[in-house]
Amino acid sequence: YMRF
């Protein structure tokens, strides 16, 4: 996921 984007920043996780």
Swiss-Prot record:
Keyword Secreted among UniProt keywords: yes
Keyword entries, A-Z: Amidation, Neuropeptide, Secreted
Compartment list: Secreted
Keyword Glycoprotein recorded: no
GO biological process, one term: neuropeptide signaling pathway
In-chain residues carrying the UniProt-annotated modification Phenylalanine amide: 4
GO cellular component: extracellular region
Domain of life according to the entry: Eukaryota
Family the UniProt entry places it in: Belongs to the FARP (FMRFamide related peptide) family.
Protein name: FMRFamide-like neuropeptide YMRF-amide
Record organism: Hirudo medicinalis
Lineage start: Eukaryota, Metazoa, Spiralia, Lophotrochozoa, Annelida
